[in-house]
Amino acid sequence: MTEKEKQQAGELYNGNDKELVAERVKAKKLCVEYNAIEYNDYQKKTRLLDRLLALRGENTWIEANFFCDYGYNIIMGDNFYSNHNLVILDCAEVIFGDNVFIGPNCGFYTAGHPLDYKTRNQGLEYAKPIKVGSNVWIGGNVCVMPGVTIGDNVVIGGGSVVTEDIPSGVVAVGNPCKPVKELPKEDVPEAGEKSEDTPEIAPSQQPLKAQQAGAEKPAAAPPKPKKTRRVIGIEEISKK
């Protein structure tokens, strides 16, 4: 097996493999290019995301700065929004459902390292996938660790470190992150359902010209992405 095949199989692999290094360099360059794009150039940003990510839905907006390891392991559903300084270490798949909102300074880390220092010092590491359901709000400064699944209709409190799976329909917070409250049934939309109060693009996502004009939507309608996929909810995600 190649080191990349070992990586995708969840086995220990050498992160310094030439093929993997070249792919990370390519992704980092695209991230730097993305972060340098003028803030309100929505079309240019989305075109670059189509080059970087595996799949994305409609109304994708990621505030600069954004960094990832490979890009081709990341899938985003419709109405994805992240505030500044999102980091996704996608050595394995990272899948987001629809209507996912992420606060600033959040990280999703699939990468892990052996506890044995002799093995670790050889450059060996492993990766476990991360899955996030639909209708999820993640507060600022949250870390999501390797192998975690977050259900549908979940709120993760700011500053949390998510080390274990979080079930659907709860508020969870802490280090380690634990459910502290169940969301009322009437406050929980069906997975994939969009609230009437949720705009297609949140005000902070709108290009500056549209905001200055008081428009509810961007001045120019963004083109449909070349690659789209409806990610309905955690049950569908779990089939991956």
Where is each model-derived feature located?
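Short arginine-rich
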Residues: E33-N35, D165-G169
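Beta-rich strand-turn-strand
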Residues: G139-D165
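Flexible, glycine/small-residue-enriched loop-and-beta-strand segment within the central core
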Residues: Y39, F66-T149, V170, N175-G192
